[in-house]
From Swiss-Prot:
GO CC annotations on file: cytosol
InterPro entries: aa-tRNA-synth_II/BPL/LPL, Ala-tRNA-lgiase_IIc, Ala-tRNA-ligase_IIc_anticod-bd, Ala-tRNA-synth_IIc_core, Ala-tRNA-synth_IIc_N, Ala-tRNA_ligase, Ala_tRNA_ligase_euk/bac, DHHA1_dom
Ranges that cross the membrane: none
Biological process annotations from GO: alanyl-tRNA aminoacylation; negative regulation of DNA-templated transcription
UniProt-recorded name of the protein: Alanine--tRNA ligase
Record's keyword terms, sorted: Aminoacyl-tRNA synthetase, ATP-binding, Cytoplasm, Ligase, Metal-binding, Nucleotide-binding, Protein biosynthesis, RNA-binding, tRNA-binding, Zinc
Cofactor-binding details, from the entry: Binds 1 zinc ion per subunit.
Free-text note on domains in this protein's UniProt record: Consists of three domains; the N-terminal catalytic domain, the editing domain and the C-terminal C-Ala domain. The editing domain removes incorrectly charged amino acids, while the C-Ala domain, along with tRNA(Ala), serves as a bridge to cooperatively bring together the editing and aminoacylation centers thus stimulating deacylation of misacylated tRNAs.
Signal peptide (from-to): none
Subunit structure: Homotetramer.
Function description: Catalyzes the attachment of alanine to tRNA(Ala) in a two-step reaction: alanine is first activated by ATP to form Ala-AMP and then transferred to the acceptor end of tRNA(Ala). Also edits incorrectly charged Ser-tRNA(Ala) and Gly-tRNA(Ala) via its editing domain.
UniProt-annotated binding residues for Zn(2+): H564, H568, C666, H670
Species for this entry: Yersinia pestis
Region (Catalytic): 1-461
């Protein structure tokens, strides 16, 4: 009996654990150690700094099952997913790694033992082929002489990519740095499938499938191309879990393995699809994996960066669901089946299941509103197409108006053997960006152009006043030697107590002074390693190399400190009350209030808001010390410090601890003790995007001022209802009850008036060809009363056509009622449409009842006069 995908994953990890490897958990899909990577796309990503010698681990051998995404950027498999047997946006990479420990001999023998041993994968040896780099005699000899692979199944691959060391069998991290030859293992599916062995003209066929790549990092490539031997050669291997599962489960497509069979069945169930061979089922089954795990790892659908790639994948899945005939939101329903098939590998996803489902459901509901209209427009454009390429302008219009990512449009075109002018799309996109830049403000932001080579030493953790030297001056974005009174500028100092805006905390304000000049600082920004003081010179002249006294606005700084410390307490309290899925998604900390964005899938309940507020105030009353410590990033994480999603940290980080309640990485300014905050009050809780909530709050003096405002308001209301604060609720309730009673009495009077009006009107009905017709313009009647009057008149007249109108605030309100016995000849909707167009309006409704509005009050009498002839022509 073949192994399940989950059993294969576990067997791989167990095998290498038995060989002395540390089993390391999969890292997040959002790389935190490589800003050049959009998503984690290989098992070695989390060990990159170890291979580069920048990081050390407590182990020299490791094994992982790493979650990977390839969609967007250099490694983009999105357009092929669903159309081939092996492309995925999400996959798991099984890997074993040696950091200067074992090398080629053990790496090759480990791989062969796992693949062929009866105890492990038990693959037929005669089905396995291997490749080595053309000059890697050491690896060749190990395969041939130690392992015993026949020479005809060992293939040397040279530089087949157009340059020295540019080969399928030579791996490089970049233009410089660690690199080396690699050896790939292929499985032969048999001669009933087309394709040739690696290196042959038919190598792109599906007969010979690469299942494992073993990289031997033995060189350090220099900028001049020289290959220097590494002092400690290392090993990095990767084997796609889905590929090896297909081999071990004796199927030719990854989409036929147990994991995908179950997922595809779930997709068919939620979409109502019956053709289980549909490519759309494969697309959706693949996409739910990448989408669910990306959201679980903190990515939220948006229109930029990682969030936009996620949105593209979601919308592609929704469109394929639409093709399958899905009539309602379906994508979010696949999270539960996904968790079931992924087993232990989905433990973190299971913790955040509700949040992931909510984000997916919200995104699908938003896109569903425009999907049908967008597809109709695309169909219309394609029907008019004379060539085989859709123009970029149309593709951009679909993106801009209907939210269609260009690859979704390309998907539709591909199904019809058409192409999209993607270069034209990019031109249209760039034109929009240019228009946005041109209209974004009244003038140029010269400060954004500033580039400063020097660095500023920040002394603001311990000082609010500092003697310093001017190292650079910028006016209108350009470096100058001096500035004069009345000129706006940016001043850079060699050292400063002013905090430059970062981490959500606004920049400081204050003054730079010397004996002859005063510079008013209105903002402080960071320019690389320099800190720039933005403001205006109010007196004198200031030159480069002048000495100044830097004076921070202490009162403002202290308010900011309290608010920043409160955000840390708030973050910890939210995780305590709502759950560990809460993560900071953004913040603003200034001297007036604090704003905190966080991941959560629904609006907070009033009692949850109260609990969070109480918990923060409890920590304030505990008056815990706020302590900072600088340490290595890994040590900080081991200590439990929360790193913020999307932030890039140096190797040395500042850890801020508030007693036993909060530990976070933070470079901002803070209170000395939590008691300094004084008081914390939440102002609002709201949503900003799918799965993102926002809290605004005040502290200290701001919180006390809020209490005073609320107290004053209560006093004012108590005075108005002739009560006091103690019985205010009862007094207000009594006023509301009295108001409701009076409203009911007023409505009864209006109903009586309408009945009386109806009774007097019924006598004015005319007979038109044997049918009763009543047309009347009423004064002093509310528009909403017209419907009640029509119902009354129908009862009184038995069989009739009734047209009533009234005017208010220069607007016309119309209603037409037709008893059901007459709707075969006269339909209320048709009659009211004729009247409405005469008074500058439109309307509609059922055959027996229709309403309309208009704006031309003067035309109403003539419009009503035309009704008799209109009815007569149809009777």
């Amino acid at each position: 009996m073949s192994k399940s995908t989950a059993e294969i994953r576990q067997a791989f990890l167990d095998f290498f654990h038995s060989k002395g490897h540390q089993v390391v958990s999969s890292s997040t899909l959002v790389p935190n150690n490589d800003p050049t990577l959009l998503f984690t796309n290989a098992g070695m990503n989390q060990f990159k700094d170890v291979f580069l010698g920048l990081d050390k681990r407590a182990y020299s051998r490791a094994t992982t099952s790493q979650r990977c995404v390839r969609a967007g950027g250099k490694h983009n498999d999105l357009e092929n997913v669903g159309y081939t047997a092996r492309h995925h946006t999400f996959f798991e990479m099984l890997g074993n790694f040696s950091f200067g420990d074992y090398f080629k001999h053990d790496a090759i023998n480990f791989a062969w033992e796992l693949l062929t041993s009866e105890q492990w994968f038990n693959l037929p040896k005669e089905k396995l082929w291997v490749t080595v780099y053309e000059t890697d005699d050491e690896a060749y000899n190990i395969w041939a002489n130690e392992v015993g692979v026949p020479h005809e199944r060992i293939i040397r691959i040279g530089d087949n990519k157009g340059g020295a060391f540019a080969s399928d069998n030579f791996w490089q991290m970049g233009d410089t740095g660690p690199c080396g030859p690699c050896s790939e293992i292929f499985f032969d599916h048999g001669d009933h499938i087309w394709g040739g062995p690696p290196g042959s003209a038919e190598e792109d066929g599906d007969r010979y499938i690469e299942i494992w790549n073993i990289v031997f990092m033995q060189f350090n490539r220099q900028s001049d191309g020289t290959m220097l031997p590494l002092p400690k050669p290392s090993v990095d291997t990767g084997m796609g879990l889905e590929r090896i599962a297909a081999v071990l489960q004796h199927v030719n497509s990854n989409y036929e393995i147990d994991l995908f069979r179950d997922l595809i069945a779930a997709v068919a169930d939620v979409t109502g699809a019956t053709d289980l061979s549909s490519k759309s089922l494969r697309v959706i089954a693949d996409h739910i994996r990448s989408c669910a795990f990306l959201i679980s790892d903190g990515v939220i659908p948006s229109n930029e960066n990682r969030g936009y790639v996620l949105r593209r994948i979601i919308r592609r899945a929704i469109r394929h669901g639409n093709m399958l005939g899905a009539k309602e939101t379906f994508f979010y329903k696949l999270v539960a089946p996904l968790i079931a098939v992924m087993g232990p590998a989905a433990a973190e996803l299971k913790q955040q299941q509700a949040m992931v489902e909510q984000v997916l459901k919200t995104e699908e509901e938003q896109f569903a509103r425009t999907l049908e209209r967008g597809l109709a427009l695309l169909d219309d454009e394609l029907s008019k197409l004379t060539g085989d390429t859709l123009d970029g302008e149309t593709a951009f219009r679909l993106y801009d108006t209907y939210g269609f990512p260009v690859d979704l449009t390309a998907d539709v075109c591909r199904e019809r053997n058409l192409k999209v002018d993607e270069a034209g799309f990019e031109q249209a996109m760039e034109a929009q960006r240019r228009r946005a830049r041109e209209s974004s403000g009244f003038g140029a932001d010269y400060n954004s152009l500033i580039r400063v080579d020097s660095a500023s030493q920040f002394s603001g953790y311990d000082h609010v006043q500092q003697h310093a030297t001017v190292t650079a001056l910028f006016r209108n974005g350009e470096a100058v030697d001096e500035i004069h009174a009345g000129e706006e500028a940016v001043v850079v100092l060699n050292r400063t107590p002013f905090y430059g805006e970062s981490g959500g905390q606004v920049g400081d304000k204050g003054e730079l002074k010397n004996a002859t000049a005063t510079f008013s600082v209105t903002d402080t920004q960071k320019y690389g390693q320099a800190i720039g003081h933005v403001g205006i010179l109010t007196t004198g002249t200031l030159r480069v190399n002048h000495s100044v006294e830097a004076l921070v606005d202490v009162v403002r700084r202290n308010r900011i400190r309290l608010n920043h410390s409160a955000t840390h307490l708030l973050h910890a309290a939210l995780r305590n009350v709502l759950g560990e899925h809460v993560a900071q998604k953004g913040s603003l900390v200034n001297d007036k209030y604090l704003r905190f964005d966080f991941s959560h899938f629904e609006a907070m309940k009033p009692e949850q808001i109260r609990l969070v507020e109480d918990l923060v105030n409890e920590q304030i009353r505990r008056n815990m010390p706020v302590q900072t410590e600088v340490m290595e990033l890994d040590a900080a994480k081991e200590k439990g410090a929360m790193a913020l999603f999307g932030e890039k940290y140096d190797d040395q980080v500042r850890v801020l601890t508030m007693g036993d309640f909060s530990t976070e990485l933070c470079g901002g300014t803070h209170a000395s003790r939590t008691g300094d905050i004084g008081l914390f009050r939440i102002l609002t809780e709201s949503g900003t995007a799918a799965g993102i909530r926002r809290i605004e709050a005040v502290t200290g003096e701001g919180a006390i001022a809020l209490l005073h405002q609320q107290s004053d308001l209560l006093q004012d209301v108590a005075h108005l209802v002739k009560g006091d604060i103690h019985n205010l609720a009862d007094k207000v309730r009594a006023v509301l009850d009295r108001s409701k009673m009076l409203e009911r009495e007023l409505q009864q009077l209006k109903d009586q008036q309408a009945a009386q009006e109806s009774a007097s009107l019924s006598s004015s009905a005319k007979l038109i060809n044997g049918v009763k017709l009543l047309v009347s313009q009423l004064d002093n009647v509310e528009p909403k009363m017209l419907r009640t009057m029509v119902d009354d008149l129908k009862n009184q007249l038995g069989s009739a056509i009734i047209v009533l109108a009234t005017t208010a605030d220069d607007k016309v309100s119309l209603i037409v009622g037709v008893t059901k016995d007459l709707t075969g000849k006269v339909k209320a909707g048709e009659l009211i449409a004729d009247i409405a167009q005469q008074v500058g309006g439109k309307g509609g409704g059922r055959p027996d009842m229709a309403q309309a509005g208009g704006t031309d009050v003067q035309a109403l009498p003539a419009a009503l006069a035309s009704v008799e002839a209109w009815v007569a022509s149809r009777m």
